[in-house]
Amino acid sequence: MLFNAVHNSLPPNIDIDHAILRGEDHPPTCAKCVARGRISALGSLDLRYHSLRCYAAPPDVGRCEFVPPRRRVLIANQGLDVSRLPPTGTVTLLLADVEESTHLWQMCPEDMATAIAHLDHTVSEAITNHGGVQPVKRYEGDSFVAAFTRASDAAACALDLQRTSLAPIRLRIGLHTGEVQLRDELYVGPTINRTARLRDLAHGGQVVLSAATGDLVTGRLPADAWLVDLGRHPLRGLPRPEWVMQLCHPDIREKFPPLRTAKSSPTSILPAQFTTFVGRRAQIS
């Protein structure tokens, strides 16, 4: 224990340096040395414990629901709901887009405008009903992203979206679980990239999951839902292939063409190994 180590190494009534964070969004901890403050180490064991404890990080630091104190104050001043903030840490991302969106907009722009408005309402309602959060209304084009602290909630939300009539729109949905980072209220990093590549594998009306998410939802799926193993597939631009699963339910389509895996293509027109022509005049003449 930190307290025991400090108590056993120091005599009573001496000063101890403790790190204090000032003007930061993170709570003070003894490991950070941003600004120095001094407290007196009292002789009483109980007083020492409480003195040191006031510098320790709150027990919920590191959880995806944790919101730094300073940010909570700013949120409260603006009248925002803390529960609707994008979660960080380990979360399950749901990333979806409209299949053949560009073609649909060109062929029937008025119908698509109505369908997109209906989609926005349906997506917002489904995400809220399952405890998810949308960092932004739109991610890229007609795609959207939602974050869930529980993988089972993300799977239930994806299933509800596919069971809802959105014609002429058909959604391609990918689910993946991992560590996420927020930058300007947008998720960045490997997890969002892998989720996007998973979504790109899917067809309209299909929900695909990574192995990480599949493991978490096994035994926790909505009633009558099940998973189908689609095997291991490469993901465009990523070095590690992914074991892909499909979320199935009697109310949604089950059979699809093979996943949209990127076809391998040469990355260079140069030979794999250079050939020297020095001393080979006879052969090349």
Curated annotation (Swiss-Prot):
Family statement: Belongs to the adenylyl cyclase class-4/guanylyl cyclase family.
Family annotation (SUPFAM superfamilies): Nucleotide cyclase (SSF55073)
Database matches in PROSITE patterns: GUANYLATE_CYCLASE_2
SMART domains: CYCc
Domain Guanylate cyclase: 92-199
Protein's UniProt name: Uncharacterized protein Mb0915c
Cited InterPro entries: A/G_cyclase, Adenylyl/Guanylyl_Cyclase_3/4, Nucleotide_cyclase
GO MF annotations, alphabetized: adenylate cyclase activity
GO biological process terms on file: cyclic nucleotide biosynthetic process; intracellular signal transduction
Organism: Mycobacterium bovis (strain ATCC BAA-935 / AF2122/97)
